[in-house]
Amino acid sequence: MSSMSMSSSSAPAFPPDHFSSTDQLCYVHCSFCDTVLAVSVPPSSLFKTVTVRCGHCSNLLSVTVSMRALLLPSVSNLGHSFLPPPPPPPPPNLLEEMRSGGQNINMNMMMSHHASAHHPNEHLVMATRNGRSVDHLQEMPRPPPANRPPEKRQRVPSAYNRFIKEEIQRIKAGNPDISHREAFSAAAKNWAHFPHIHFGLMADHPPTKKANVRQQEGEDGMMGREGFYGSAANVGVAHN
C-alpha cells in the first residue's frame, strides 16, 4: 500500500485473521475482476490516498481512505466475519409513504410561505384529515368599530316656528309682565287669523277678512301693528 502525500507503505490484502489489532479494516471493490477486497489500513495512513493491489487479479487500485463510514471496527472486535450483512430493504409501501410525505411537506411549506406573503394578518393552520393535508386560513379577530355618536342634523326652522318666536318676543317687549304661556297663545292666534303668512304673501296685500278680525277681536285684546294681537289681560286662554 502506498500513499500520495509524501509517505508510502505496502501491505497485501490478507484474510481478516492475519490483520493486526491496531489496523483499521475497510473494504475496496475491484472494478476489474468484480471482487470485494478486505484491506488493513494502518492508523498512520488514514485520511490519505493509498494504492491497493488486488490479490485476485493483481490490479492496482487508488483509494482515498477518508470516509469513516467505510471503516469497520478493529479486527479483534470483528471476529471471523468478513463483511456485515446489508440491512434489509424497506417495504415498497414505506418508500411510497416517505416520498409522498416529503412531497406534502414541500407543498405545505410553499403554500405556507405563499399565504404568509399575501395574508400578513392571518395564521395558516395545517390539519390532517383522512391522510390528506388541509389548509385553513383563520382571520385575526378584528377590533370592534368605534361607537361614534350619531350626528345631529340641524333642521331649518319652519315659517311657523320663526313667526311664533318673533311674535312672542314682540308681545313680551310690549308687556313684560305677560307670561310665556299667554304670549304663546296670542302669537298662535295671530298666526291662525292671518293666513297670508302661510303662503308667503306680502304684507302689502292683506286678506279681505282682516277688517272683520279687528272688529271681532277688538274687545278681547289690544291690537298691535299690522292687526296682530298685542299683550292684553284677556287673550282667550283658559287658566287651569
UniProtKB/Swiss-Prot annotation:
UniProt key word Heme: no
Please give the knockout or disruption phenotype noted for this protein: Leaves polarity and growth defects.
Q: Name a single GO cellular component.
A: nucleus
Is Cytoplasm there in the keyword field? no
User: Which keywords annotate this record?
Assistant: Developmental protein, DNA-binding, Metal-binding, Nucleus, Zinc, Zinc-finger
Describe tissue expression.
Expressed in abaxial regions of lateral aerial organ primordia leading to cotyledons, leaves, flower meristems, sepals, petals, stamen and carpels, but not in roots.
Tell where it localizes: Nucleus
- Database matches in InterPro entries: HMG_box_dom_sf, YABBY, YABBY_C, YABBY_N
List, alphabetically, the Pfam families matched: YABBY, YABBY_N
A molecular function annotated in GO for this UniProt entry is: transcription cis-regulatory region binding
Any one of the GO BP annotations: abaxial cell fate specification
Positions of the UniProt region annotated as Disordered = 135-156
**Which parts of this protein are zinc fingers (C4-type)?**
30-57
Which CDD domains did the record assign?
HMG-box_SF
| Top-rank lineage group of the source organism | Eukaryota
Subunit structure, as described in the record: Interacts with SPL/NZZ. Interacts with SPEAR2. Binds to LUG and LUH; these complexes promote adaxial cell identity in leaves as well as embryonic shoot apical meristem (SAM) initiation and postembryonic SAM maintenance.
Q: Which family does it belong to?
A: Belongs to the YABBY family.
Annotated protein name in UniProt: Axial regulator YABBY 3
Gene giving rise to this polypeptide: YAB3
